[in-house]
Amino acid sequence: MGFGSDLKNSQEAVLKLQDWELRLLETVKKFMALRIKSDKEYAYTLQNLCNQVDKDSTVQVNYVSNVSKSWLLMIQQTEQLSRIMKTHAEDLNSGPLHRLTMMIKDKQQVKKSYVGIHQQIEAEMIKVTKTELEKLKSSYRQLIKEMNSAKEKYKEALAKGKETEKAKERCDKATMKLHMLHNQYVLALKGAQLHQSQYYDTTLPLLLDSVQKMQEEMIKALKGIFDEYSEITSLVTEEIVNVHKEIQMSVDQIDPSTEYNDFIDVHRTTAAKEQEIEFDTSLLEENENLQANEIMWNNLTADSLQVMLKTLAEELTQTQQMLLHKEAAVLELEKRIEESSETCAKKSDIVLLLGQKQALEELKQSVQQLRCTEAKCAAQKELLEQKVQENDGKEPPPVVNYEEDARSVTSMERKERLSKFESIRHSIAGIIKSPKSVLGSSTQLSDVISVGEKPLAEHDWYHGAIPRIEAQELLKQQGDFLVRESHGKPGEYVLSVYSDGQRRHFIIQFVDNLYRFEGTGFSNIPQLIDHHFNTKQVITKKSGVVLLNPIPKDKKWVLNHEDVSLGELLGKGNFGEVYKGTLKDKTPVAVKTCKEDLPQELKIKFLQEAKILKQYDHPNIVKLIGVCTQRQPVYIIMELVPGGDFLSFLRKRKDELKLKQLVRFSLDVAAGMLYLEGKNCIHRDLAARNCLVGENNTLKISDFGMSRQEDGGVYSSSGLKQIPIKWTAPEALNYGRYSSESDVWSFGILLWETFSLGVCPYPGMTNQQAREQVERGYRMSAPQNCPEEIFTIMMKCWDYKPENRPKFSDLHKELTAIKKKIT
């Protein structure tokens, strides 16, 4: 098998093969040039990346840190990878690409040579086997005619007896010419036969075999070029593998349990002996009746001691109950973290558990603080009980022996002194009757401690990361206040207050580990707010604002981040990722997250959807479960709708869906939109992609991120950054005027999507083309197999004048009637 033996008559095929291979080589050359450019840019990008790394972050700290070492080595090895990639690009340019360029020239020369030689030998063969023989044959025929003519004239001459010799001579001459040409023709024919045989058996096969040999040599050369290309560009070469091995080895050196051992050794401090807290005996220098560390039980304190004992007992019981609750919460959270850890598919999934682990540590701190409070209360209670039990059944002794004093004073003086002591006693009794006054400063301290132990997120007046505008809507009366996390600056907290007819916002300063406005600093925000609320101290002297009424958050919708466990990623929305999640009671949910780096206005739009959905309860509208705004990132928790988005559902199930089911889907959307219309809600983004397929194929409207609720039922927009043009009514596109009528237009498009089984509206048109065509009066034709009644509804929805479009109540009635007709 070969070119010479099998391709003798395949000249055109050989030429096409050579042309194709030349085009292929040009493509390979272009690809290699782009690869070189790409590798050089990649090398430059890597180097630039390393150069931009904060140099301080790569400087070794003053203790041995494997994390720091690993990070430094990552940067160094990335620089090494940059150098390797740059070298590879240069080698690729000087090696395979250069040789490929030379090979293309050689390939062109081989083709040129083949074409030239083939034309030459083919022309020679045609000349010998056809052209020359045809000439001889033509002369042959001519000479036969001449000889026959000479013979006729000779016969005529013999018959007449005139010029016989002359005629004979002419006849002999013509015969000689013919015979000589005959011999020449016989020889030429023999030569042509041999030439043709040589052409097809030797000359042409030799040329074709020569071409095949050069083709194969070039394939061999190309293979060598490819081999060298593969070797140079390989990402598993020893030098590149070593780079990644070095990085992996440095990562493996990181041991969380020993990472800070050296840091501890470097910064270890000798524990200072704590100063013992003792009774200041100097307080007793001017009073001989009081004793250090002794409870005074007398006629002035006996009643108050009983009340104090009762209060301490209640506080101890309450603390112990809280402790049991917190300890149970610790065990529950530990269990959840352990279960979540087992489901982690990737090593980096541990990051998803950090929030829960931090919450666990905070819970443990809370437990420890409660144990401390429990111990203090128990000790104080024991001290009081001991004193009360010692004097059980006894009459409390008087503070002053008035009978002895009476010997040295007049009766008038005695009355005055009795009066003074009675007033003191009544004052104390008044204090005792007021529970808030029990224990005096000791109880106030206890109150502060209990406030401090309660995490910020658990206080009713803390609303989390709600938008400023939403906070302002909640403040309506003088002194109304709440605390929120700044939406624009996560980690910064703001006090929002209604004062003197305006809403004021005060950033809570955090300086020297203390929270304050401009006065006293506190170790946490609850203590700061509690101080200003209880003392009625102004927030700032300049503002004169006083806290009067804490505004509680709506607990129906508020969830803590710890209440939700994130699972698999379901997809990405306009504002962030959407995860499958699980509540504490194992309820599956969908969790929409908001990226922390989004602009302020987009974060507000993100929460707008939750604000709208709080008001709605309908089987054809996706349900809101709650919001997590206590910290960033903010979550919106929705019911998990298992069937996914309607558009994908239509496209996947298009071969299974029957007409009746499509009408039922349409009726579901109409029912949901009828409900929204009654609530003056304008959806503005009604489309198949924004509906979800629930259980029993119930369709639910979702994605209220662009929705607005307007009392007048009309919303004007100065412009949206992303408008779904093919779904949006003309008046909304042209004038920014949105209404339920513009939602009806979108409903018509959704109907078209439904009955076309997921085809994109205005097929073959760009957004701009579709918009221009609609303005000219164009409307889409009915989808294949779409009932005439359904298409009639679509056309009504697409009336250019909003006032002529049907209401959702009309659409619901019509679709209900159509559904009944279909069996």
From Swiss-Prot:
Its EC number is 2.7.10.2. InterPro entries: AH/BAR_dom_sf, F_BAR, FCH_dom, Fer_F-BAR, Fes/Fps/Fer_SH2, Kinase-like_dom_sf, Non-receptor_tyrosine_kinases, Prot_kinase_dom. The keyword Secreted does not apply. Residues 461-551 form the SH2 domain. It comes from the Eukaryota. Autophosphorylated. Polyubiquitinated; this leads to proteasomal degradation. Residues 123-185, 301-382 form a coiled coil. Keywords: ATP-binding, Cell junction, Cell membrane, Cell projection, Coiled coil, Cytoplasm, Cytoskeleton, Kinase, Lipid-binding, Membrane, Nucleotide-binding, Nucleus, Phosphoprotein, SH2 domain, Transferase, Tyrosine-protein kinase, Ubl conjugation. Residues 1-259 form the F-BAR domain. The coiled coil domains mediate homooligomerization and are required for location at microtubules. The N-terminal region including the first coiled coil domain mediates interaction with phosphoinositide-containing membranes. PANTHER family: TYROSINE-PROTEIN KINASE. This is Tyrosine-protein kinase Fer. It comes from Rattus norvegicus (Rat).
